[in-house]
Amino acid sequence: MYNTEKFDKDTFVPQCFESDGEFELRGQKIKYHTVSEDNVFYDDNGKAIASIFSYSYFRTDVENSENRPVMFCYNGGPGSSSMYVHAGFFGVKRLKYEEEIDRPTSLPPYQTIDNPDSLLDICDLVMIDPVGTGYGVLIDQSRGKDFYGIEEDAESILTFIEKWTHKYNRWLSPKYLCGESYGCTRTAVVAGMAGGGSGNNRGYGVKFDGLVMIGNTVTTGKYFFHPIPVEEAVVWFPTYAAINWFHNHPTDQSVDEFAMEAKKFADEEYLVALYKGESLQGEAREAIKKKISYYTGVSDKFLEDRALRIDDAGFRHEVIKHLGKSVSRYDGRHTRDQLVPYQDEERKGDWFDATGNRYDGFFYGALNGVILPSLNVKMDRQYLTFNLFDDETEDYGHPKWNINAKGGTTADRLRQAMVSTHGMRTFFANGWYDDCTDIGLVYYVCDHAGLPKDRVYIKPYKSGHMIYISEDNCKELSEDIRKFIEGKDPTK
């Protein structure tokens, strides 16, 4: 990767921008102050080596701010900036969504609105660009090894949070983490470190009251894309059913009813059928195939070619093949024309996906054109929406991004956090149509990771990977997180 800017550890100047504003929320005027700033890491000689960039929203028209809840928010990747959760959901100003499926487009003009679903009335908010993403920078290029990796990334975030807590005197505030996609992995490891009282470099005193996981990546496997010890076609089955429900309309049931019925079938019948393998013959085999096809929309030939075992890429290419289209991995409601065999489609990866980067221009344009100027951010530095780092460290299979290199799994770290921090709660929010971080994995992890069930909540949404896309989903997710912060069950 090449750079358009050069940073010198001897001359790096941290940036800080402040603003004040007011907007109407839930029938009241909310006054707020923002601080957008570099949070610098130094070497033993006092030279700047890296910076996490943060955007803090503080409500100012309250008597006591020192014990107000605060939520720290970030996206995933690894390598993503906070652009999506900032511009798409949490910001005081956010994108305006028009049609649930077809908009936002990737073409201007882009519309933003004062966020009617903001949580700022009850909770201060901090958006985080990790090192090397957004306005966060790796100043000393030789120090990437200290920040790029599951453990290293998490410890830098935890260090930042503790420093922020001290700087703004928020030790008495209830604290929440909200991560999307790989951000859920980050959340589990950060919370695990905090719960255990130490990271790899030092001890920590900050604790978290709750965790919000949007598009879960916490797993019992070595890392997110590593196989788990069960038939994965069974785990992903509810997502297949939901996508089939959306496109092929096999029933008058709601998507929630149909997908949960499909999950029950997968748990009780499909799993047994896959275990039996070739010994399942005759009428019993035909009956199972008929049910699988009913729930997922795939053909008899497709199933026989795969010994009844549905694979992700094959399903996305098959479910509306009769229309000459494939569905998206990130949001199965999105489609595109089938141009190549699905094996070639998979090799092209996200760049060939039906959703792919269709939203990036919309988010990036609105963030840079409206949202950051409203925060008085005036930066010559380029905003890096996504950093691929390099081929070695970006690979999930590389030891740097492999939790087993340190021992345990991300599910183990989440259990460590919840068991060691009495009262900590976790809320999993996943889209039915998300075939990247399928909701079935949430149910599986919660049944196998030894989590305290009375403090874990799961809710599916009628959306894809970024579940807040659409005005209705923004409102629903906001109301649910609001209930979670208030100590209520967010699923009710």
Predicted regions and their residues:
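Glycine-rich nucleophile elbow surrounding the catalytic serine of serine-hydrolase chemistry
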Residues: G179-G192
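Catalytic histidine-centered segment of alpha/beta-hydrolase-like enzymes
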Residues: G464-N473
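A catalytic-pocket lid/entrance helix-loop region that shapes and gates access to the active site
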Residues: R94-K96, A191, G195-T296
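Alpha/beta-hydrolase active-site loop
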Residues: L120-C123, P130, F147-H166
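Alpha/beta-hydrolase fold nucleophile elbow
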Residues: R170-Y182
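Short alpha-helix in the alpha/beta-hydrolase fold that links the catalytic acid
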Residues: M424, D438-H448
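N-terminal cap/lid subdomain of alpha/beta-hydrolase-fold enzymes
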Residues: Y2-T4, G46-D146
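Alpha/beta-hydrolase fold catalytic core
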Residues: Q281-C436
